[in-house]
Amino acid sequence: MERSMNFDEILSHIGGFGKFQKILYVWICLPQVLLAFHMLISVFTGAVPPHLCRSNNTTWALPASSDAFNFSLVTGPDDDPDLSCSAPGGVPSTPLAQLNHSTALALSDDHITGVCQGGWEYSKETFHSTVATEWDLVCDNANLNNIGSSIYMFGLLVGAVLFGSLADKFGRRNIILVGLTIQSTFGVGAAFAPNFYIYVFLRFVVGTTISAVIMNAFVLGTEWTGSKHRMLAGIITDYFFGFGYITLAGLAYLIRDWRKLQLAISAPGFLFIFYIWVLPKSARWLMANQRNEEAMDLIRKAALMNGKPLQEDIEIYQGYNDMVKMEERKKDTVIDLVRTPKMRRNSCIMFYLCVSSTIPSLCLSRFVNVLVYYGLSLNISDFGMNIYLTQLIFGLVEMPARTITLFTLNRSRRISQLAFLAVGGLACLLTIFIPDDLSIIRTVLAMVGKFGITASLSIVYVYSAEVFPTVIRQSGIGMSSMCARAGGVLAPIIYLLRGVSKNAPMVLFGLCTLLGAALTLLLPETAHQPLADTIEDVEGSSISEESEEGNMKPALYEECPTRNPDIII
């Protein structure tokens, strides 16, 4: 007996998470490791090691061991002017290697600050070379380092907008391939940059491709996965990103030269050239764009690989093809994200959730780093903590946060998002009531906040892919990613509010996160629900009702009730 099936029913029929999908996930997860490298590499390549100005008459050699030379004597938190930015007007009476914290503070008060004429002397205990040491991005030039990081984050924002729209037009697979190619080429180029400005430009381009690959790999996995396993599209890729987070610590420990490290994380990207032959297109996207024969070929291939071959008489419902052959047909654009009531509500809330999750995540990392810094400044260095171990621990903290979402997402997307945002927001607010001398408790609370925010970030990408319909899904995720990247640009600015009040940043993003938790209640529950393919699917009867009253029914829906073809079996 023949019956029509929508695409989610097709996936269920051929296997929503069979061998075909599992192999696909291998292909979309492998690049995530390199993406983590590119995202976090500036922690090491942009690091500023201990440094002093060489006098024209005297060279101040830095001790080889941190036991003899306290890191806090030459670098302070938040780029405060200190001993490292002082041009020596005379040789201090106390030998540099014997300075303690209080002596250094007294010395810096009397030290003459000016332009360093003799050049900079950098410690090579931790880093052999960095971007900062090669181009002297310290003191008066320190802001260039920060600006470079902001420009890179702006690249992610540009990529989210640019490649989000291009993917809806040219397909997820094509944009992934283009993104990986550009990323590897410009990443390798950055390792040979002749000056800082060219380096920043090359990193900006790499940043745009990060968004291209992350978004489209995620959507490609989502559109090939049945509703029961759809959450894996976000969580599994997050695991591989977390693995890259952890692995980078070891790689950077072994490679202390920034150019060699930049080359080591970029060159392997060329190995993905074989994706041209193995990475499939999205059958759902092909159908939504009337490329039905290609879609059916892929569906048959997936069915055969999953051990559930389709019957030979399967064909695309011809009535659908007649309906879509209109003389003038509306093209879906980014404007459609806010054109209709429910889409407008869902889109605005999703955009806000992306911003309110990203800013606290970045600020919390900085907050914990500053607490660790102050601990080291007070000579609490017997724990053996260093930048490589700290990076490793931060990566490990994210793994349980991503793991717990595997158990909560199956029950509810909406409640899971709400709960983790609430945990993150409350933890942020609680830190302001902890005295400064209880820094360990404040650090633990900050890490709890980071745990909640990390979990919410894992959920929001799964959630957003299900809230937006197929015809504008990539545009919706692209705009969401753009908002998240905007949060990345804003995070350092918000952290500057510490100059007004040390608790201001925590209060601000704690309240913003709690507001996001409340707004989540207005979103639809998407767990175990079929993906919407058209805006009409999202709006339901509201479009028809508004059409009768205000004649605002889009041309797309006048003759075609759905852009997702029915299948006759």
Predicted feature residues:
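C-terminal transmembrane bundle
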Residues: 36, 40, 203, 238, ...
